[in-house]
């Protein structure tokens, strides 16, 4: 049963799909490329892209019916899956050595070693994977969370101001944004995600009802995204130009972001284990408000139809 609104485009019928994407981590370039190159239209999809600051904001857009699909890094995803009837329909990025090394711990000049973090104010964008990163990093360095203060912020600009005026002493940053922090007097690198023993993956999610009522639409959306991924991989400079057009990101900075992203489509046993391990940690820390089974929140039917070989999760 297809319930989507349909429109005629160049005499061809297309289905409107509202895709919420982020402007922060990697900038959702595979979505932007798929739209710009006409891949959605080719697959019968009239994509309406809407920009949000972080993945968590796209999840809220799905929960409040502003969007059909959203995307989120593992941590925000797990915290959100119990809030509404949403399902994971594919992995979008997998953390690798390159992306882990790119995500750096930047600190004020008086912090020379991990131990100097004690008594300091650590910046954390609320509800994002950085909460997990800090916890893992501090545990790895044997620093008690009681000995530090977390300072929440909601946008990178807020964090930059915080670092400048002394409200924040240390922060995690990656990609193009990193240079903005490094340009602040006395800010240096102390470590990276690899030293925290953490990888960050991100996922595509949607309302369960949308997925169940529109299987073909979801399948075609995934096909268009796959072409978007291939385009970005093979046309990094052109994608960087697109980033400048749409996000006003300087091309050389966007290029850095694109080079470190490991865009994928698929869902493997490893993807599921990554989420399950993090979910257990959240439960043990008492951070997961809603009870649910991960397996009930995964719907890979469309992905299996579009790219059967990309799914190894049973």
Q: Which residues are covered by each model-predicted region?
A:
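Small-molecule pocket liners
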Residues: 94, 99-105, 187, 200-204, ...
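Short, glycine-/small- and polar/acidic-enriched structural segments
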Residues: 5-144, 169, 175, 198
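Conserved C-terminal helix/tail region of periplasmic/extracytoplasmic solute-binding proteins
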Residues: 283-314
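Secondary-structure end/capping motifs
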Residues: 212-289
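Solvent-exposed, polar/charged alpha-helical surfaces in well-ordered, non-transmembrane soluble domains
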Residues: 29-32, 37-38, 60, 64, ...
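Pocket-lining segment of extracytoplasmic ligand-binding domains
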Residues: 75, 150, 157-245
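Sec-dependent N-terminal signal peptides of Gram-positive bacterial secreted proteins and lipoproteins
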Residues: 1-2
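Short acidic capping loops at alpha-helix termini that bridge into adjacent secondary structure
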Residues: 115, 145-149, 252
């Amino acid at each position: 049963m297809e319930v989507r609104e349909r429109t005629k485009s160049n005499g061809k019928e297309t289905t409107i799909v509202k895709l919420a994407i982020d402007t922060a981590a990697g900038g959702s370039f595979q979505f932007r490329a798929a739209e710009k190159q006409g891949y959605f239209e080719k697959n019968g999809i009239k994509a309406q892209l809407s920009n949000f600051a972080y993945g968590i904001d796209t999840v809220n857009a799905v929960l409040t019916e502003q969007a059909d699909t959203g995307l989120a890094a593992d941590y925000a995803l797990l915290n959100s899956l119990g809030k509404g009837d949403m399902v994971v329909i594919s992995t979008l990025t997998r953390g690798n050595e390159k992306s882990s090394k790119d995500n750096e711990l930047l600190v004020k000049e008086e912090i020379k070693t991990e131990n100097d973090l004690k008594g300091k104010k650590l910046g954390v964008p609320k509800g994002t994977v950085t909460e997990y990163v800090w916890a893992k990093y501090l545990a790895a360095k044997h620093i008690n969370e009681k000995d530090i203060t977390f300072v929440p912020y909601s946008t990178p600009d807020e964090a930059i101001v915080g670092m400048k005026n002394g409200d924040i002493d240390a922060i995690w940053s990656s990609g193009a944004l990193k240079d903005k922090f490094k340009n602040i007097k006395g800010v240096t690198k102390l470590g990276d995600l690899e030293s925290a023993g953490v990888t960050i993956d991100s996922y595509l999610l949607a309302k369960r009802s949308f997925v169940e009522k529109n299987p073909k639409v979801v399948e075609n959306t995934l096909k268009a995204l796959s072409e978007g991924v291939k385009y970005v991989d093979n046309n990094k400079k052109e994608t960087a130009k697109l980033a400048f057009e749409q996000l006003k990101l300087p091309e050389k900075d966007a290029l850095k972001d694109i080079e470190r992203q490991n865009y994928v489509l698929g869902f493997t046993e490893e993807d599921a284990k990554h989420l399950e391990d993090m979910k257990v940690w959240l439960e043990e820390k008492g951070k997961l408000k809603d009870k649910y089974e991960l397996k009930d929140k995964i719907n890979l039917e469309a992905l299996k139809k579009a790219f059967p070989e990309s799914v190894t999760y049973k």
